[in-house]
């Protein structure tokens, strides 16, 4: 089954590292863009991930878990069935 995930990462302030959040977000985007079978579009507010449902869930299980262990952060997700893109009419 095809699915679409909207994901946002909000790193919480790291002690004495005010600009660190930009590096954390850019690293996360770089890491998830390496996943095969997924198409990722990013903007200033969130990223949209298109792909097979099982691959998207695997991304959540692996990458999100790792970032939550490593950084104080909050993730916001929305997931829906199909390729939910206005450009795919």
Question: Whereabouts are the PLM-identified features?
Answer:
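Charge-rich, low-complexity N-terminal segments
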Residues: 1-89
């Amino acid at each position: 089954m095809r699915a679409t995930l909207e994901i946002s990462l909000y790193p919480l302030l790291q002690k004495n590292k005010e600009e660190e959040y930009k590096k954390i977000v850019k690293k996360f985007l770089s890491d998830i863009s390496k996943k095969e079978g997924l198409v990722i579009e990013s903007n200033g507010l969130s990223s949209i991930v298109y792909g097979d449902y099982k691959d998207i869930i695997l991304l959540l299980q692996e990458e999100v878990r790792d970032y939550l262990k490593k950084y104080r952060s909050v993730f916001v997700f929305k997931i829906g069935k199909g390729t939910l893109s206005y450009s795919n009419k």
